[in-house]
Amino acid sequence: MDATAAITGNVDKTQIPPLNQKRILAFVNHFLVSTCTFLNEFALGCETKFVEMERQLQKTEAALIILEAKLASIPTEHHVATEATEAPAISNQQRNEEASMVDTTEPPTTENPTEPELPPESVGVRACEDQRYRKFFKMVQVGVPAPAVKQKMQSEGLEPRILDTPDLILADGQRE
């Protein structure tokens, strides 16, 4: 029998000897074992990567919680401005008292510590002072990228364009 004849199909198939069953069984066994080994290693590798990603996600979540706590502890611009105006007012009062003690012949000047004049109240609240938007302005102030903050604002159902205009007066603004 010619080897090329088996390929071309000009062979009487009744004359071809049967395949050895033990050899076929060995090939099938080898294929199954190697395939199972590959799939087990692949699944183990995937599981390892999932565990690693979960750890990274937990670390990121912990860092986010810490960052939110730090943001909550930062005073807002309104509180800082109030404290800054109170300190000069106190020092002006002390100067006035010292001046009146030193110069008894001259009448004391009528320098009353003036409280900062607030502009006439608008109909609403500035966006940066609004209770809903304050934490987002803090996040930008601390250094969180603005696109990420806008995405978070949108996920909470707020208008992200307000972040670009902090002095915008909101008619439906909420104060503390």
Curated annotation (Swiss-Prot):
Acts at least in part as component of the WASH complex which may regulate wash nucleation-promoting factor (NPF) activity and is required for its membrane targeting during endosomal sorting. During embryogenesis, not involved in the wash-dependent developmental migration of hemocytes anteriorly from the tail. Residues 47-74 form a coiled coil. The gene is CCDC53. GO terms for cellular component: early endosome; nucleoplasm; WASH complex. Residues 104-115 have a biased composition (Low complexity). Component of the WASH complex. This is WASH complex subunit 3. Residues 84-123, 152-176 are annotated as: Disordered. Pfam families: CCDC53. It is found in: Early endosome. Belongs to the CCDC53 family. Keywords: Coiled coil, Endosome, Protein transport, Transport.
